[in-house]
Amino acid sequence: MSRKLITINQVKDYVGQEVTIGAWVANKSGKGKLAFLQLRDGTAFFQAVAFKPNFIEKFGEEAGTEKFDVAKRLSQETSVYVTGIVKEDERSKFGYELDVTDLEVIGESQDYPITPKEHGTDFLMDNRHLWLRSRKQVAIQQIRNAIIYATYEFFEKNGFIKFDSPILSGNAAEDSTELFETDYFGQLAYLSQSGQLYLEAGAMALGRVFDFGPVFRAEKSKTRRHLTEFWMMDAEYSFLSHEESLDLQEAYVKALIQGVIDRAPQALETLERDVDALKRYIAEPFKRVAYDDAITLLQEHEADKDTDYEHIEHGDDFGSPHETWISNYFGVPTFVVNYPASFKAFYMKPVPGNPERVLCADLLAPEGYGEIIGGSMREDNYDALVAKMDELGMDKSEYEFYLDLRKYGSVPHGGFGIGIERMVTFVAGTKHIREAIPFPRMLHRLHP
């Protein structure tokens, strides 16, 4: 079969022309002289129509009938080369369809386990390698790709250099109780929770750096917002103030949303995402509220009939219901700033004049998606950082390189991190984070 091989998302450039598409059969229907093939190739889904008389006219009665019978017998996920004439189709959401002129089976698929009927979550997760082929799962991964692309584009435009932090580390970045341990030639090593400590070294060398890679948290959590392995973007920068950092974070999140709208509009449509809401999050300024003011707001509204969060006191950390209420109250992504030092990381710089609060921020996404970014200014004074580590009983010998950064030309600096899967979940409008990564690793889920 001689062919002009294209992908489905290219068909708009070939209206009226004969092309060939390599694809899988997602579904099929029809009767009599017609067969409707729902095709997918990773770029999009669309319909190809096989009409028996056209096959007979081209190949003769016997060969044409045999070709058409092959089309009618195609099973779900059979791979094919389909040749045909591209036509515009206003009835289709995709806008085009293919009038089939030839067909070649590449690989047959028998008894495909994920049929169009409903399946339970455990079954779908056990067959994740196949579930990824479904229309909605493809859309989610396309959104993930758009977010990753927009990440690199944003940091390139803003003068950041990609800086690769190690996955194996001899110390903890944050909470030592959530570390995966491994033997490193007789030494105890940990899988990285965050590249932040190493990025601070990068910022002292290169000014503005970012990292993007997998991180690991040994959290025994089964919520819809937690994974044990996920992909984190961490950024670190020298000479920026706290307010400038918040401006940068806001611009970054808006760039990610715009990137998805620009690069994956069909995916958003497939997922029935409210694009007008996403556009509003871009257009309107993000809200900024101090932690103590947020606590006061929660206390003032806890008796409202539509609230479902527990009472909270100043000094307490937020639970998911508190975060949901705060972001929904303001209606846009909301920065909560200046949390208590008591439950934040040791390296965060105190608020000037208020050592019980630190210069940090969590960005809470609306619609119940909760925290998507965490960031802070870092303590840049050597003596102050040593005193904090002593107060917490930390072994400073494990952080010699980190302390050195404060001894040799320390400067004001800060950074932030975003879990890409949380951002994907928010932009895609999905309910569970497990669908935001190709092969999720969660409590009790290590396969496939």
UniProtKB/Swiss-Prot annotation:
<keyword id="KW-0547">Nucleotide-binding</keyword>
<dbReference type="Pfam" id="PF01336">
    <property type="entry name" value="tRNA_anti-codon"/>
</dbReference>
<dbReference type="InterPro" id="IPR004522">
    <property type="entry name" value="Asn-tRNA-ligase"/>
</dbReference>
<keyword id="KW-0648">Protein biosynthesis</keyword>
<comment type="subunit">
    <text>Homodimer.</text>
</comment>
<dbReference type="InterPro" id="IPR004364">
    <property type="entry name" value="Aa-tRNA-synt_II"/>
</dbReference>
<dbReference type="InterPro" id="IPR012340">
    <property type="entry name" value="NA-bd_OB-fold"/>
</dbReference>
<dbReference type="GO" id="GO:0004816">
    <property type="term" value="F:asparagine-tRNA ligase activity"/>
</dbReference>
<dbReference type="GO" id="GO:0006421">
    <property type="term" value="P:asparaginyl-tRNA aminoacylation"/>
</dbReference>
<dbReference type="InterPro" id="IPR006195">
    <property type="entry name" value="aa-tRNA-synth_II"/>
</dbReference>
<keyword id="KW-0067">ATP-binding</keyword>
<dbReference type="GO" id="GO:0003676">
    <property type="term" value="F:nucleic acid binding"/>
</dbReference>
<protein>
    <recommendedName>
        <fullName>Asparagine--tRNA ligase</fullName>
        <ecNumber>6.1.1.22</ecNumber>
    </recommendedName>
</protein>
<dbReference type="InterPro" id="IPR002312">
    <property type="entry name" value="Asp/Asn-tRNA-synth_IIb"/>
</dbReference>
<dbReference type="GO" id="GO:0016740">
    <property type="term" value="F:transferase activity"/>
</dbReference>
<keyword id="KW-0436">Ligase</keyword>
<dbReference type="GO" id="GO:0005524">
    <property type="term" value="F:ATP binding"/>
</dbReference>
<keyword id="KW-0963">Cytoplasm</keyword>
<dbReference type="GO" id="GO:0005737">
    <property type="term" value="C:cytoplasm"/>
</dbReference>
<keyword id="KW-0030">Aminoacyl-tRNA synthetase</keyword>
<dbReference type="Pfam" id="PF00152">
    <property type="entry name" value="tRNA-synt_2"/>
</dbReference>
<dbReference type="InterPro" id="IPR004365">
    <property type="entry name" value="NA-bd_OB_tRNA"/>
</dbReference>
<comment type="similarity">
    <text>Belongs to the class-II aminoacyl-tRNA synthetase family.</text>
</comment>
<dbReference type="GO" id="GO:0140096">
    <property type="term" value="F:catalytic activity, acting on a protein"/>
</dbReference>
<dbReference type="InterPro" id="IPR045864">
    <property type="entry name" value="aa-tRNA-synth_II/BPL/LPL"/>
</dbReference>
